[in-house]
């Protein structure tokens, strides 16, 4: 875990889950007198800003945890684009917060959204735009994501895995099957409610099996603003099966557990997902 200096700013609240939260309006700044922490190289713009009881408070959009610069402008999509590494855009923060709340209401375990705030500071982008930094603040049971396994203390990893027994209603002996059951059930719940996460991978699940990062997602309450994006939604559900499959495989490898792909396919089938229907046909006439 690496410490970074940060500076505190005045702010206004754009969204809040409740009034009883502490807010951490910090940006990375080598001259600042606040401390924030990055727990690994894959958490580019997310930092631990505090701990409350058994939960970690995370802030997203506070600047970069790599390079000597706090923000790096890329201007993707067009010359007028505002995409900037280290920065969280208002539209993305809003969607992350609101879609996440929709998913949580269905019983899927996610990060607990706390607030979206706008800082009283101006950032001057090379395209001529002036933005105020936006921060998304949330809490998690475990700050380490599945992809962080190479950087975790093994004792801490084992402690997180032991907690999975609370979900082991089917008495699995292999730990990756417990995780698989949780994740596939999450898919079933989301897809049955016309929810697309659209970014399921090992960086967006924690070792407490919390699903994160909903800024690319959509729900019936918060559909995509562009009709062309909405039109493609039905075709995107399928790939989430295989994105989840990759995470399950990753976990099995990390835990050095032998994985049976037939067993995983059968587990998908239990939840109504037929992996076999995606296999290629052996000849032109469709005979398998």
Where are these regions (language model features)?
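Regulatory N- and C-terminal appendages and interdomain linkers associated
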Residues: 1-40, 65, 80, 174, ...
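Conserved ATP-binding subdomain of kinase catalytic cores across diverse folds
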Residues: 24-163, 192
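Short, glycine/acidic-rich beta->alpha junctions
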Residues: 91-95, 182, 197-199
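Conserved hydrophobic core/spine positions of the Hanks-type protein kinase catalytic domain
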Residues: 99, 185-186
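Catalytic activation segment of kinase domains across protein kinase-like and atypical kinase folds
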Residues: 121-138, 195-249
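Intrinsically disordered, low-complexity linkers and terminal regions
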Residues: 164-167, 219
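Activation segment of protein kinase catalytic domains, centered on the conserved DFG
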Residues: 168-178
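Protein kinase catalytic-loop region centered on the HRD/HxD motif
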Residues: 188-195
